Structure formats: C-alpha cells, structure tokens
Amino acid sequence: MIRHTAVDVPPGTCYGQTDVPLKDSFEQEAEAVVERLQPGRFDAVYSSPLSRCVRLARFCGYDEARLDARLMELNFGRWEMQRWENLSGPQLLAWYEQWIDTPTEGGESFMDQYRRVTAFLDELRRLPYRQVAVFTHGGVIACARIYTGEITFEQVFTTMLPYGSVKKIVV
C-alpha cells in the first residue's frame, strides 16, 4: 500500500475526501516512491479516485490503475477543509470521545471507513493476485494494518505512516 505524497493544505486543516492539491515537492517525493517500489511487478494496481493518489499512481507508471471509492480517506463531512481549532459543538466532543464509532458531522465514523476498506480487502483475497499495489491514504492503510492485526484501533493516530510511505500488507 502506497500513501500519497504531501498535500498543499495549511497545517491544522481537517481534510479527508476533499480533492486537495499536492505540494510543489511532489516530483521529488514521487521519485522516492518509485525507488521503493522497484522492482514492482504487480498483478493488479488499484487507486483511490482522489487526484492525490491517481497522480502518484500515474507518476509511478500505472496509468491504468483501477479506481475504487472504498480506498478513499475518511469522509469528514461538514468538517472538511475547516481548521481543527475552529471546530466545536457536541458532535465534535462526541467524536473526540468515541471517534471509532461516532460519525463526523455529515460524514462517517472510522468504523464506517474500516468496513469499506475491509470489504475491499476481503474481495482482494478472493482474487487470484499475489502482488497488488494500492495507492491510497493514511487512514486506509491504518484500516488495513488493523485488519491484519499489525496495530489496534487505539494505535491509529500514534502509528500513522508519513506521506509517500510504501507499506507491505499481507492479507
């Protein structure tokens, strides 16, 4: 699983399924991803449909990556593109206390995201592929790591992989 490169969003901004731009350092970061993927011979290549993932997949030579909405980041609903420090209200407090099961305002819960990611992984397991590349997001990779038992739900925020990471997941 490959996490997209750094996004051009002000620090402290809540974003998930918003199609945000990448930083000017994209090519340099993407070259490092290409090096980590070599000699990448994949039976199939998938990508989140968000441009930050599609652009990286194409840069890495996978113009025909299969787009799958289940690989999108968490939907933060009305919180998208708001500064975390400006968010308030009972829904935010409930989310902070029970972020696994509480949906964001107008969005989804982490458990909602986990279910769609595990549905993708369950489907992938039934296919005859041995090696698959998946261009996606930090939250999706965290869900996959929970699915395989590498981390727990409680470790999601303390073990988030950096932008441009390549993480081998065995399902």
Show the residue positions of the predicted features.
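Domain-level recognition of soluble alpha/beta enzyme cores
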Residues: 151-171
